[in-house]
A protein has these predicted regions:
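Rossmann-like dinucleotide/phosphate-binding beta-alpha-beta segment
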Residues: 1-71
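Rossmann-like dinucleotide-binding domain for NAD(H)/NADP(H)
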Residues: 72, 78-164
Length: 164
């Protein structure tokens, strides 16, 4: 999607070789190599998830997937919580099957007291932020400015940000 493509472009601009996996099976119009899931897992140093939750992505990153990843791999789930199995991720981190994870979504939110991820106290292995971590004062101010401009344009009968 748009977010994944944006992240891929930034990574590419920093000199990363970008590959991707498409759970939908659709080949994107991007200059990156598409891999089958198992190859994608074996080759990736960093996996950044920006996918919707559906039958094909639910529990996609589970014990089987973590067993195929590099021990030095970092997993970022910025999509939907249930794409990653929290218990299996905890085990993978505790056993050194992957190096680290960064999450702004969880399998069940708000996080429950018995979530196994809470056992991991090492912030070099696991960082969890709210899904609204983008919500800096500047971002929220810009958002409100856009809302104001859209309302002002609408009351004048003007089209703004219209895709034709």
């Amino acid at each position: 999607g748009t977010i994944g493509k944006g992240v891929a472009k930034i990574a590419s601009d920093f000199g990363c070789k970008v590959i991707y996996y498409s759970a939908s099976g659709k080949t994107q119009d991007v200059p990156y190599e598409r891999e089958e899931f198992d190859e994608f897992l074996k080759k990736s140093d960093i996996i950044s998830i920006h996918a919707p939750l559906n039958d094909k992505t639910n529990n996609l990153f589970n014990k089987e997937a973590f067993d195929k990843m590099k021990a030095s791999a970092v997993l970022l789930n910025l999509g939907r919580g249930p794409i990653v199995n929290d218990a299996d991720l905890t085990e993978a981190l505790e056993q050194g099957k992957i190096a680290a994870a960064g999450l702004d979504v969880l399998g069940k939110e708000p996080i429950e007291k018995d979530n196994p991820l809470l056992r991991i106290k090492d912030s070099t292995k696991l960082v969890i932020t709210p899904h609204v971590a983008w919500g800096t004062v500047e971002a929220r101010t810009r958002l409100m400015d856009e809302v104001y401009e859209n309302i002002a344009a609408f009351t004048k009968g003007e089209a703004r940000n219209a895709v034709v």
